Amino acid sequence: MNILPENTIFVVLSFEGPDAYSMAGGLGARITYLTQTLASMGFEVHHIFIGDPHMSKVEAREEGRLTLHRWCQWISEYHPNGVYDGEEGKLYDFNESVPPFVVHGLAAPAISQGKLIAVLGEEWHTAEAISRISDLLHYEGLRNKAVMFWNTNNTYGFERINWARLSYAITITTVSKYMKHIMRNWGINPLVIPNGIPKEILGEVDEAHVMRLKGLIDTDFIVSKVARWHPDKGWKPAVEAMGRLRSTGKKCVLLARGGIEPYGGKILKRAQSIGLKVRDVCIQRRPLDEDSNAIGEDAFEPYFEALSHAGTGDILNLLFPIPHSFLKVIYRASDVVLANSLHEPFGLVDLEAMATGAVVFTGCSGEDYAMHLVNSIVLDSFNAEEVKFYIENLQAHDEEKKGIQAAARETAKQFTWDKVVRSLLRKLEYQTEVQQRALT
């Protein structure tokens, strides 16, 4: 069966979503791009998520093809600090109320019109709900008219999942071969459907912005790193590599954007203990388009001002949210983007940086797309000496660097959301055939 807008309706379940209240990390962005892409292809899509309590319960977007269903708003009213504030209460309500709504309010009417229902769940929070939806569809005699995928991007919450029940009822997917092998240890053999990046990231970066950023940083070599302050994210080898480069007389600056995690203080103290000068960089006024990704001189001016007032340092600690539009400028201006995580289920930051033509240093876990010295530098260890070696190697081999930059951009083009969704559709079609054969 071909899955087409005329014969299929999508129902997507997640905790995170497109609202600022609902956006806590990469999942919010992933699910927003996924639903938007499906809708842009003509599909009717219903996205059920923990929404902002002060926004409308139901909202139509993408010319009516995408319907947002903001769930648990009555609970979120008492928990203003985002999607995971009051998590357990929201989870209970989600599990109790979403399944009957999906089956009776969305699936049954669509199936009565001869349509297929594709239900997609994201992360451990939706594992129970999607299992209950399957049970209820079966009870109503409708299960054979639905294809159901549940996806995980990480191992968070695995201990709370009833794997036997979930894998019996639902097709399980994940985002990389690395995650597939991890999940085999749990007795699960998932399908692999990669993550994606929006096409807009592939747009050209204004070289005037890039040159201005470079001119504000007094160095011969710019390294950037954007990640949570966490031991697995490779901050320690990153700062120690900077220290070793400095000790050889090389002039390098690390642009560091972490989170609010206390581990950041430990890393910055470590940097200072090996002789690195750390400068905190704050913006003095709010950007005009902070909540959008608008590109313009005025929108970027607060960031340029902040960097111009930072003074000289070996590490510039960026203490402000950075929109994708300005991140692209940082990546493009960087000689190296460090994405050297010990455990990286997919590596979305890596791909976003590669889309700008940056040379990315990846880890060697979930970055299936990374090819050493072809489109990136794939690090084999968590060793600062390896980071230092390849930085020096790039400085000495400019033609090789240019080749990596060109290949990186071409690689990123293969992972735009429209291509990822095509892969998803083919796997849904395959699973639909498997289900139909099982019934005959």
Predicted regions and their residues:
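Aromatic "clamp/platform" in nucleotide-sugar-dependent glycosyltransferases that forms part
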Residues: 342
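Conserved donor-binding/catalytic core segment of Leloir-type glycosyltransferases
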Residues: 212-233, 239-242, 254-258
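Carbohydrate-associated surface elements
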Residues: 178, 196
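A conserved catalytic-core segment of Leloir-type glycosyltransferases
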Residues: 2-10, 37-117, 264, 278-314
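Conserved acidic donor-binding segment of nucleotide-sugar-dependent glycosyltransferases
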Residues: 373, 377-384, 393-398
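Short hydrophobic beta-strand element within catalytic cores of glycosyltransferases
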Residues: 358-363
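Short alpha-helical donor nucleotide-sugar binding micro-motif in glycosyltransferases
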Residues: 329-334
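A charged, aromatic-enriched C-terminal amphipathic alpha-helix characteristic of glycosyltransferases
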Residues: 399-430
